[in-house]
């Protein structure tokens, strides 16, 4: 499975590391020695998936960069053609923390007219309505970063683990803006890479099966030595703490 292979290719081997396999979807979690089979875990919609090396990948599935991709596609249909770099630059220039969405809200899950759906979500929840393209894209980025924090808090509550670093894997590692925001929101360092985590994880597992390496951990150390990664340190964490308080209240209202 692509997610399990990606996690096998983690470039961070710290015991307190969490992972985020990030692309069209976001799968955030940690490795455990055994499944977490509790009512609380079920209520928080956390899943246990068999991983590499006899471990369990305990995670939450969240929407991901599909939201940016779909927004870009809808804008292009309206004659507004932007590169991903254009969208990032406009988002960087937009007002921070103007409004938020739950990336997993049912009304945002279908194709078509996503910018207007985001506006309607903000109107429905009594928030400021994003008007410009930059405000809409920034809303998506900030909401993803805050949802990552929310999910890791849930995982911490269920496992008792405190996380000291987040390893982002896959195509999302190329999105520096999202990596920055994840570090700021969660208030832990983010290590982005490897990009081709799924392929590398697959290679590691095959090398182990062939006896070329002794363990997945040995393969991860090879990846850490040979693959390019980038580290992001938390910044402006007080601002993000304030935004998270508002965001958490929004999610709690939506869940009722």
PLM region spans:
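Active-site core segments that coordinate phosphate-bearing ligands/cofactors
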Residues: 1-165, 174-198, 204-235, 239, ...
